[in-house]
A protein has these predicted regions:
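Extracytosolic ligand-binding ectodomains
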Residues: 1-224
Length: 224
């Protein structure tokens, strides 16, 4: 269920390419194969010294979306592959070679890699699934930041955003004397990240919602 929202990225007549490197994330690969299901896909190994032509040859022309699933398991591999995709895209544009829309499916831990060129996230339309995301360009987040800085004199942390969400969802019920508020299973979006609380077989209630983060080449970030 974690990667359920990625399903539509692979639907229809898409050119799907799995890219591996020297170090790969086997667990992520299994999850992506499950999401892709019976849709056909290509596979390529890209490492330092690999001719970029190998990627160029796998790109579909105008009218077909290209979805690259990057399975590299470390920062070096991810950086190498994203740079190669960007280079191939630039080369094809320079040669006026028609290319379908390019999307990259990656991992949420990429945001913790300090040396990645974040502009490539936008250029290559990177998507990943995460348990929490707060984009400071979002209007709601910007408003929260402004009020938080006025009150505390510093920029809020990720824990500040999560704390705000918790108060918005549970504060009213707790103030009314209810230890646990009624949770209907509906999706709640206190700030930007969605939540869906459901009760499992053991009677425990927890958040089952995962957010799909998508960077757009128009320099926007959507979270759903």
């Amino acid at each position: 269920r974690r990667y359920e929202k990625m399903g539509p990225l692979f639907e229809g007549d898409k050119n799907i390419v799995f890219i591996t490197s020297d170090v790969n994330d086997a667990a992520f690969e299994r999850e992506m194969k499950a999401v892709v299901g019976g849709n056909p896909y290509q596979r390529v190994v890209y490492r330092k010294g690999t001719p970029s032509q190998q990627i160029d040859e796998m790109l579909a022309g105008s009218g077909t979306d290209n979805v690259f699933v990057v399975l590299a398991g470390d920062e070096t591999g991810v950086d190498l592959i994203l740079a190669a995709l960007s280079s191939v895209q630039n080369s094809r544009l320079a040669r006026s070679k028609r290319t379908g829309h390019i999307m990259v499916v990656g991992n949420s831990r990429w945001v913790r890699y300090r040396n990645l060129d974040r502009s490539l996230f936008f250029k290559l339309n990177v998507s990943f699934v995460t348990s929490y995301h707060a984009y400071r360009g979002n209007e709601s987040v910007l408003d929260f930041d402004r009020r938080y800085i006025e009150a505390f004199g510093r920029v809020p942390s990720l824990y500040s955003y999560r704390g705000y969400d918790a108060v918005k969802m549970f504060g009213g019920a707790v103030a009314a004397g209810n230890a646990v508020p009624a949770l209907s299973g509906s999706v709640m979006v206190p700030l930007q990240t969605p939540y869906r609380f459901e009760t499992g077989a053991g009677g425990n209630t927890g958040n089952t919602e995962w957010a799909l983060v998508t960077y757009g080449n128009d320099y926007t970030i959507s979270v759903r």
